[in-house]
Amino acid sequence: MQFMGTASRMASTQRAKPMEMPRISRDTARMLVNYLTYQAVCVIRDQLAETNPAGAYRLQVFSAEFSFQDGEAYLAALLNHDRELGLRVMTVREHLAEHILDYLPEMTIAQIQEANINHRRALLERLTGLGAEPSLPETEVSDRPSDSATPDDASNASHAD
């Protein structure tokens, strides 16, 4: 019974404190905006590769010089470099956000839950030794009589002496 209390206390201390939630939410939103900026650039680059290969190359070269770690700084630099392309990235990024964000919460929770189950299963298998059957060395397998041996095989083996 004491173990359950200890586990319960550990779980409650591992949860984020309510005052941390706004900061975590802001950081997550910022990271998602940066990622959607990156995805918008990828979509546009792929479109340009089909219609304007030189434009796709220029976007690729520009993107190699600027980090997507800060999507807003990337976008500001792109707007200074090529206003039309910057506006296009903003439009595509907004479109992606409008269409993906509805599904994101439940997809994220489902993927995290599934991944956690798989990690826990692998850990349990590793701790209990149930994950992998130990394989027998080849010499042991060849020294044992086969279950599929026929009576003729047994009589042939005894006459070989």
Curated annotation (Swiss-Prot):
Its main location: other. Keywords: Bacterial microcompartment, Carbon dioxide fixation, Carboxysome, Chaperone, Cytoplasm, Photosynthesis. InterPro entries: Chaperonin_RbcX_sf, Chaperonin_RcbX, RbcX. GO terms for biological process: carbon fixation; photosynthesis; ribulose bisphosphate carboxylase complex assembly. Residues 147-161 have a biased composition (Polar residues). Residues 1-20, 130-161 are annotated as: Disordered. GO terms for molecular function: protein folding chaperone. The keyword Nucleus does not apply. It comes from the Bacteria. GO terms for cellular component: carboxysome; cytoplasm. It is found in: Carboxysome; Cytoplasm. It holds the Pfam family RbcX. The homodimer has 2 functional domains, a central cleft essential for production of soluble RbcL in which the RbcL peptide binds, and a polar surface which plays a role in correct RbcL subunit arrangement. Homodimer. Interacts with the exposed C-terminal peptide of endogenous RbcL ('Lys-460-Asp-470') via its central cleft, as well as C-terminal peptides from other cyanobacterial RbcL. Contacts a second RbcL monomer via its peripheral polar surface. Belongs to the RbcX family. An RbcL-specific chaperone. The central cleft of the RbcX homodimer (RbcX2) binds the C-terminus of an RbcL monomer, stabilizing the C-terminus and probably preventing its reassociation with chaperonin GroEL-ES. At the same time the peripheral region of RbcX2 binds a second RbcL monomer, bridging the RbcL homodimers in the correct orientation. The RbcX2(2)-bound RbcL dimers then assemble into the RbcL8 core (RbcL8-(RbcX2)8). RbcS binding triggers the release of RbcX2. This is RuBisCO chaperone RbcX. It comes from Synechococcus sp. (strain ATCC 27144 / PCC 6301 / SAUG 1402/1). The gene is rbcX.
